[in-house]
């Protein structure tokens, strides 16, 4: 057991015991934590079954059983979406809203019981430490899924990426310049990967073929709030694995000189400068990396 895992496991044991995770009735709600968490996640605004499944990462059958329990107690109502009857909407009943407010109040009381004994300085330290821990854990555990470039989450992520380039490039950015990339990253030809949190995209990236044996990393983007937590490096490694799976022995990429944090990440990941290999009008630096592992072999040829 490493020191890192030992500290994390000790914290898990301490915290779960302190907040009553093992109690049959979490915070005196009459429900265990799983049911209470679902009730809280539905909230006054309601949610779709699909959103709840994705937010809580629950198996469909298990989520159905939890919703049935809340429904049997008169706390939630599940009905088809009038705008799309393939979707199901979940909303709180009047009794459910009362239960939700009680759960929210007791959760706040529990949190206060932890922070109130601390001095103001130590509260600030705890808040900063928890914010950092929350971001790092989410970045390390978020699911990276391969989708078609036309997937709604992927389209939204690329839209954020293009908007950021337009803001940061001195000359702006014309999204039409990369319109053909989506087709070349479709399954079979390439790969496109997206990461979502609470139903919203927080990172994306793709791989397309430059020529046989050489893949290109494209559209690498991480939401600003998630930067500095290692998600970009994790996405890059994932894309390299996708490139190897597609049979590429080497990957290349281009970038703009204004994206200094991206250039730093590429250099730390083992990328080396190479000559220009495309006609991208926004590219000012080009990099390459020889892949190692299954599906690849060492190659010294250049782009």
Model region roles, listed by residue range:
Residues 21, 139, 146-218, 223, ...:
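Acetyl-CoA-dependent GNAT
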Residues 222, 228-241, 264-268:
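Conserved acetyl-CoA-binding loop-helix of GNAT-fold acetyltransferases
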Residues 46-88, 97, 199-200, 204-206, ...:
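Canonical helix-turn-helix DNA-binding module
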Residues 146-150, 249-269, 275-303:
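C-terminal "cap" of GNAT-fold acetyltransferases
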Residues 50-51, 214, 236, 242-256:
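Conserved GNAT acetyl-CoA-binding A-motif
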Residues 1-34, 153-158:
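N-terminal leader segment of winged-helix/HTH proteins
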Residues 105-145, 149, 287-289:
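Terminal interaction helix/tail motif
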């Amino acid at each position: 057991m490493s020191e890192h895992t030992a500290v994390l496991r000790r914290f898990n044991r301490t915290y779960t015991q302190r907040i009553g995770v093992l109690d049959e009735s979490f915070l005196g709600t009459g429900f265990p934590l799983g049911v209470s968490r679902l009730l809280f996640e539905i909230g006054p605004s309601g949610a779709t079954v699909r959103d709840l499944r994705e937010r809580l990462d629950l198996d469909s059958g298990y989520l159905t059983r939890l919703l049935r329990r809340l429904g049997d107690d008169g706390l939630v109502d599940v009905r088809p979406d009038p705008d799309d009857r393939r979707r199901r909407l979940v909303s709180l009943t009047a009794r459910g809203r009362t239960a939700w407010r009680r759960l929210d109040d007791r959760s706040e009381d529990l949190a206060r019981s932890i922070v109130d004994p601390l001095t103001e300085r130590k509260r600030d330290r705890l808040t900063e430490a928890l914010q950092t821990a929350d971001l790092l854990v989410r970045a390390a555990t978020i699911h990276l899924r391969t989708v078609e470039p036309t997937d709604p989450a992927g389209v939204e992520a690329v839209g954020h990426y293009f908007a950021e380039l337009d803001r940061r490039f001195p000359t702006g950015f014309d999204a039409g310049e990369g319109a053909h990339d989506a087709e070349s990253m479709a399954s079979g030809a390439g790969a496109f990967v997206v990461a979502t949190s609470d139903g919203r995209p927080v990172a994306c990236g793709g791989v397309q073929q430059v020529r046989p044996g050489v893949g290109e990393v494209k559209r690498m983007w991480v939401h600003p709030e998630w930067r500095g937590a290692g998600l970009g490096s994790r996405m890059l490694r994932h894309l390299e694995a996708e490139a190897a799976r597609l049979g590429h022995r080497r990957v290349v990429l281009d970038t703009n000189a204004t994206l200094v944090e991206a250039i730093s990440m590429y250099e730390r990941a083992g990328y080396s400068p190479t000559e220009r290999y495309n006609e991208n009008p926004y590219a000012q630096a080009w990099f390459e990396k020889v892949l190692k592992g299954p599906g690849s072999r060492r190659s010294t040829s250049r782009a």
